[in-house]
Amino acid sequence: MTAIQLIVGLGNPGAEYEQTRHNAGAFFVERIAAAQRVNLVPERKFFGLTGRFTHQGQDVRLLIPTTYMNRSGQAVAALAGFYRIPVESILVAHDELDLPPGVAKLKVGGGHGGHNGLRDIIAQLGNQNTFHRLRLGIGHPGDASKVSGFVLGRAPRAEQEKLDASIDFALGVLPDIFAGEWNRAMKNLHSQKA
């Protein structure tokens, strides 16, 4: 299994969206940066906040696009192209309507499932969809017409605590992910629920 060289956290920029459900992926990357004592700095050529740390001799880059969600691929393609990071070495963390709060799941490849950030990443990577995903459950409002307001809204405290717990679970399996032990990482992560 290819080593992960880039971890992307999806979200929308600006104070208006900072604490919204749609920014779950960005929360995950912020937590990694804090744990690794990495300062995320704006990089105009990568359209986002970036940082880097070394894990067992391997550079791992962090990216939070500062484009809007539906343009996330611009940032991912720019950074991955510049550093020649293969699509299979990218992990994208994002909010997932189809999972309840408190649940996180890993996935390799697949479609965008209606997620505009994933849709743009796949398009900007030349229709390659073999990157890894960390799906952070935010739940579903129950009515498709309410999805936009739901993902762009703040979660109630109990829901946010469950999302935070699922991020903790995901951080706990990062050593397995870095070691390429995807089956073990999936088994451990998928058995936990806040």
Swiss-Prot record:
Catalytic activity: an N-acyl-L-alpha-aminoacyl-tRNA + H2O = an N-acyl-L-amino acid + a tRNA + H(+)
Residue numbers binding tRNA: Y17, Y68, N70, N116
MF GO annotations: peptidyl-tRNA hydrolase activity; tRNA binding
Active site positions: H22
Top-rank lineage group of the source organism: Bacteria
Keywords from the UniProt entry: Cytoplasm, Hydrolase, RNA-binding, tRNA-binding
E.C. code: 3.1.1.29
One CC-aspect GO term: cytoplasm
Gene Ontology biological process terms, A to Z: protein quality control for misfolded or incompletely synthesized proteins; rescue of stalled ribosome
InterPro entries membership: Pept_tRNA_hydro, Pept_tRNA_hydro_CS, Pept_tRNA_hydro_sf
Site (Discriminates between blocked and unblocked aminoacyl-tRNA): N12
Quaternary structure (record): Monomer.
Family per similarity comment: Belongs to the PTH family.
Protein name per UniProt: Peptidyl-tRNA hydrolase
Organism in which the protein naturally occurs: Pseudomonas savastanoi pv. phaseolicola (strain 1448A / Race 6) (Pseudomonas syringae pv. phaseolicola (strain 1448A / Race 6))
